């Protein structure tokens, strides 16, 4: 009897140990991968993920631009709250202009509010590795990811090298293996811009990405820990066609003495000199194909306008138009209202903690608390709510 009891408790111990094995989280971002590319193009890998795991799409934060949204994904904060309010902006406090084209400014932590998930994880004893995710080469909260790469240090790793790097990190001994691994890839965004979302070139790059991920997954499933890896593939925003000549021109309506700076085109942030915001708004009344707001009057659903880095006046173009003084050729663009389906982005997930389910499109600020739930860590303050998507979790 004692022998049987011993065997029972030994088996129970082994079972509990096995079930308590830690899970790992891998997040891959494909810049500008519109949510319905999987319906327009042949994407067997994405289809496989949908068949085995979670199929949905992400609603971007406003404005639906790359840098603000990648940082929203990892902090759970809207751009207005984390401070990267656009790809370029004027900081009223410092008087400096932030631009992705200025490497020194881009890695200055003063611009980055909130707490990225790699910092949250490391503060709670976990390890992280991040391949080129926007903001990962910035010392935020006094920390970098445990493993990271400087984006402006060239040559950059190719997408094949990044994906192989993920496999390499997962292949490390358990004591060295990161709990969270994230990787960013610039495509299909640039093809979408140059050729539009529905073109042979975009079809080609979507097929190439799918093939690379198929190869990546084939390597992943051969790892001893394959059944302990949660894989998420997502994007920051979608893409929409802007026809040739669809430029909304505003400069001729404005007096130079009213304006300190105009930044961006989707939307345009107008930084006004003291006392001239009303003059700018009045001058732009009746503008075709765009809405004009003082920052305090931006619709609440956009969660935008309270940050001092947002211009005093925002000009928000209709879908299919852009704020520009030039007559531009047609091309793909993003930055539009997140309510536009064209702006919605890919989301797929599969692994030991995910159900097989399809859910409605959800906010990208919910990703940060989701990652914290997967990692078993306490999130920092954020605008997301993992309970809104709890049905995707086992």
Residue ranges and their predicted role:
Residues 38-82:
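Short, structured active-site-proximal loop/turn typified by the sulfatase FGly-forming signature C/S-X-P-X-R
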Residues 27, 45, 208-250:
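Metal-dependent active-site segment of extracytoplasmic phospho-/sulfohydrolases and closely related
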Residues 157-171, 188-229, 278, 371:
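A long, amphipathic alpha-helix that forms part
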Residues 21-26, 51-55, 123-129, 175-181, ...:
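Loop/turn elements at helix/coil->beta-strand transitions in domains of secreted/extracellular proteins
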Residues 77-196, 324:
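His/Asp/Glu-rich, glycine-adjacent segments
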């Amino acid at each position: 009897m004692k022998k049987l009891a011993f065997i029972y408790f030994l088996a129970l111990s082994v079972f509990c140990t096995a079930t308590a094995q830690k899970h790992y989280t891998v997040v891959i971002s494909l810049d500008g991968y519109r949510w319905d590319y999987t319906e327009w193009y042949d994407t067997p890998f994405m289809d496989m993920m949908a068949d085995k795991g979670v199929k949905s799409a992400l609603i971007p934060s406003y404005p639906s631009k790359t840098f603000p949204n990648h940082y929203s994904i990892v902090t759970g904060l809207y751009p207005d709250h984390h401070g990267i309010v656009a790809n370029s902006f004027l900081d009223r406090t410092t008087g400096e202009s932030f631009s992705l084209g200025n490497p020194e400014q881009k890695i200055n932590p003063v611009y980055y509010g909130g707490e990225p998930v790699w910092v949250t994880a490391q503060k709670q004893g976990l390890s992280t590795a991040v391949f080129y995710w926007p903001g990962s080469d910035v010392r935020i909260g006094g920390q970098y990811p445990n493993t990271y790469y400087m984006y402006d240090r060239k040559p950059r790793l190719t997408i094949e090298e990044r994906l192989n790097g993920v496999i390499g990190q997962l292949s490390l001994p358990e004591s060295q293996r990161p709990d969270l691994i994230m990787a960013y890839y610039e495509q299909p965004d640039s093809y979408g811009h140059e050729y539009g979302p529905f073109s042979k070139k975009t079809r080609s790059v979507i097929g190439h990405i799918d093939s690379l991920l198929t190869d990546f997954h084939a390597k992943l499933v051969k790892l001893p820990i394959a059944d302990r890896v949660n894989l998420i593939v997502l994007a920051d925003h979608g893409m929409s066609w802007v026809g040739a000549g669809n430029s909304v021109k505003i400069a001729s309506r404005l007096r130079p003495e009213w304006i300190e700076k105009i930044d961006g085109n989707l939307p345009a942030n107008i930084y006004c000199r003291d006392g001239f915001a009303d003059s700018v708004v009045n001058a732009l009344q009746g503008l075709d194909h765009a809405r004009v707001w003082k920052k305090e009057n931006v619709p609440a659903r956009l969660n935008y306008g309270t940050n001092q880095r947002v211009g005093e006046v925002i000009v928000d173009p209709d879908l299919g138009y852009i704020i520009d003084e030039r007559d531009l050729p047609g091309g793909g663009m993003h930055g539009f209202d997140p309510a536009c389906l064209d702006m919605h982005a890919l989301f797929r997930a599969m692994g030991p903690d995910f159900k097989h389910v399809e859910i409605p499109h959800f906010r990208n600020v919910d990703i940060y608390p989701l990652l914290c739930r997967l990692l078993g860590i306490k999130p920092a303050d954020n605008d997301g709510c993992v309970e809104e998507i709890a049905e995707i979790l086992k």
